[in-house]
């Protein structure tokens, strides 16, 4: 009797989980209805990304900046936090990354209404590839076409290697991207994309590359602007 009453007490004290927006419930229902393996696939992807991947590393700092970097085989990105922009309420956007020889702010909040999803697109494209643990090394176009190196990479990293080693809008890039199109896309949960050593790391406004793949057209026009020194 005592165990039974204790069980009932626990049941009464049980708190409901977080309330999700109706639109999200509709999306979940439609996804499950369309593919019975949807939930299992998402859980496996989350477990996979919880264990693997590269992380942002603190390097050093001076009076004005904290310097950070992330590396993934032949890829490297330099980032910094502007100290005077760091706020106590954690709502600031102090992050910048080095692109094309200049420092560009990311995660900036805009006061005017509008569609800002594509503002930091180049950063999130490169970030998706950098946090992935695929072995991005020894790229050779002939070997890539034979499939020797290509199938060691996930779809996002394979697209990234093509963009890095070919010219924008070239026929060579288009042919290689068409070959990569056969790869199975690996979903990367957005919580993993934002996992960082600091609380003010920016939110991803565009889910391209994380919940769905970049198109051939988008990669064909993409410029590689990182500095890998």
Swiss-Prot record:
Protein task: Determines virus infectivity.
Principal localisation: host cell
Keyword presence, Heme: no
Keywords attached to this entry: Host cytoplasm, Virion
Stated name of the protein: Virion infectivity factor
UniProt cross-references to InterPro entries, sorted A to Z: Lenti_VIF_2 (IPR009979)
Secretion signal, residue range per the UniProt entry: none
Localization terms from the record: Host cytoplasm; Virion
Source species, domain of life: Viruses
Gene Ontology CC annotations of this record: host cell cytoplasm; virion component
Keyword Metal-binding part of the UniProt annotation: no
């Amino acid at each position: 009797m005592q165990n039974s009453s204790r069980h009932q007490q626990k049941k009464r004290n049980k708190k409901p989980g977080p309330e999700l927006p109706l639109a999200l419930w509709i999306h979940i229902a439609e996804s499950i209805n369309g593919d019975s393996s949807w939930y299992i696939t998402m859980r496996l992807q989350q477990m996979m990304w919880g264990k693997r991947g590269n992380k942002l590393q603190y390097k050093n700092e001076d009076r004005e900046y904290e310097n950070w970097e992330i590396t993934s085989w032949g890829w490297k990105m330099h980032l910094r936090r502007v100290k005077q922009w760091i706020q106590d309420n954690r709502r600031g956007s102090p992050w910048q990354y080095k692109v094309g020889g200049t420092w560009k702010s990311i995660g900036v909040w805009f006061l005017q209404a509008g569609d800002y999803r594509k503002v930091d697109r180049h950063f999130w494209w490169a970030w998706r590839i950098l946090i992935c643990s695929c072995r991005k090394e020894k790229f050779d176009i002939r070997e890539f076409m034979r499939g020797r190196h290509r199938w060691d990479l996930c779809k996002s990293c394979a697209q990234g290697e093509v963009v890095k080693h070919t010219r924008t809008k070239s026929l060579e890039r288009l042919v290689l991207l068409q070959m990569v199109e056969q790869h199975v896309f690996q979903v990367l949960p957005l919580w993993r994309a934002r996992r960082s050593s600091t609380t003010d790391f920016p939110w991803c406004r565009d889910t391209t590359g994380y919940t769905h793949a970049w198109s051939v057209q988008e990669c064909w026009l993409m410029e590689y602007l990182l500095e890998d020194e």
